[in-house]
Amino acid sequence: MTTFTKLSEQEAPSLSVHPTRRISKINPNIYAGFTEHMGRCIYGGIYDPGNPLSDENGFRKDVLEALKELNIPVVRYPGGNFMATYHWIDGVGPKDQRPARPELAWLGTETNQFGTDEFLKWCEVLGTEPYFCLNFGTGTLDEALAWVEYCNGTRDTYYANLRRKNGREEPYNVKYWALGNETWGPWQVEQMTKEAYAHKAYQWAKALKLLDPSLVLVLCGQDGTASWDYYTLKQCLLPLNSPLSTSAVPLIDMHSIHLYTASSDHRANATAPLAAERAIEITSSLIDLARIENGVPADQLRPTICFDEWNVWDPIRAEGSKGAEECYTLSDALAVAVYLNVFVRKSKDLGMCCIAQSVNVISPLMTTKDGITKQTTWWPLYLFSRYMRGWTISAHLSCSTYEGETSPKWVRGVKDTPWLDVSATLGEDGYVNLAVVNVHDDKGIETQLEGPSGEVSVFTVTGDNVNVTNMKGKQEVGIVESTWDGKGKYVFPKHSFTLLRWKA
């Protein structure tokens, strides 16, 4: 939690950090990933059989090693929009017997050479948990139940035995399951009204929890600010009515929201993720309102927010049907850092956040047949995932604000947009971690910093200007490490992300 006091341009900025004031435990799942059958994310991304850089499973070893640096706790799969016409049964069993299918989300052909077992094996190699999305387009409840049985079944039943026949004796114990993806969108196969979706989601959730009460089910929301979000929460956050249920076990565990931001103007681009903060606040209130109106018992666990698609994405410059391969700038890296600050500040409400996506498609990590490139956006993600864990702690910022146009425009009316964007954590190792983005592209901001009592480790991500990239054969943006004595004022460089660490 960071409180804020708005100053004039003439007043001196200050920042205080209070490690004894713990706000909330940070769920490690806010650093989750996402791999969709889209563009080169799967084929030519995480899976590239025949490439000398791949292992015996066809998994790109360089990609695995890079992703291990991020300590990713969960990876969402297989979509995304792709999911609306995907049938999991096509992607299991002998590969020479798997059918190729037309793919309607991104207008390609799905070979099904990489499916459920391959993905779950990849997760085990990476050391992460899977998060599956169910087909709410052309799929059926029977198909969804069969998939859960295939993954998690322990009894002598058909789909559990099919898994065993395919070479996996022990269950995979897949915990996280989404009830569809963006079913409200006009681009979806089988787009639904909020009324139709809420009815279907509730009925599916009942059946899925009867089959496996340990499942964590995610309701499909919109952007957290829409009537869709309120209606679906109101209809689905109901007291359970089943002889197998208890009041402490909810039917719906998380509510999903999505947001992509982008602007050609740096200042609007870097402050745009503040829209995510307001969306989280509104969604949290809608969850509480639905529970209050429905009379949900206080001892029934409160659902959290699953922000399972977020990133900088301009679909004009990086079209989805052409693989959505963004060339990220320093400005985009600062926007990603602001997103991550938001997630730390709002950790109390968040059960998961998935950057979209993990490889090649609007991704911080790009592959060629010969190697990988870490884009500008990789570096703030790496620093946050490595250090910004443990507890969100109190901080107070006083500085002036950016007063120009925001993207989306409604942010201007609901959020302050300070030149500095801040979050702070206390790690299990006893270190304070302070993340600061200086959005200003013209000047460094000298700030009176209260909190450090000794030497401070400093990690700085910046570049020559806000438009530099790492995709032109040179790493223009990376991490510069230094130290500071922790006394007095610190100058946050123009257009930079800075992480400061000191012993509490």
Curated annotation (Swiss-Prot):
Location of this chain's protein in the cell: Secreted
Molecular function GO terms recorded: alpha-L-arabinofuranosidase activity
Catalytic activity: Hydrolysis of terminal non-reducing alpha-L-arabinofuranoside residues in alpha-L-arabinosides
EC number: 3.2.1.55
Top-rank EC class of the record's enzyme: hydrolase
SUPFAM superfamilies the record matches: (Trans)glycosidases, Glycosyl hydrolase domain
Keywords: Carbohydrate metabolism, Glycoprotein, Glycosidase, Hydrolase, Polysaccharide degradation, Secreted, Signal
Record has Membrane as a keyword: no
Biological process terms in GO annotation: arabinan catabolic process; L-arabinose metabolic process
Pathway(s) served: Glycan metabolism; L-arabinan degradation
Pfam families: Alpha-L-AF_C
Lineage top rank: taxon: Eukaryota
Glycosylation sites: 152, 181, 269, 467
CC annotations in GO: extracellular region
Function according to Swiss-Prot or TrEMBL: Alpha-L-arabinofuranosidase involved in the degradation of arabinoxylan, a major component of plant hemicellulose. Acts only on small linear 1,5-alpha-linked L-arabinofuranosyl oligosaccharides.
Similarity field: Belongs to the glycosyl hydrolase 51 family.
Protein name stated in the entry: Probable alpha-L-arabinofuranosidase C
Organism: Aspergillus terreus (strain NIH 2624 / FGSC A1156)
Classification lineage: Eukaryota, Fungi, Dikarya, Ascomycota, Pezizomycotina
Gene: abfC
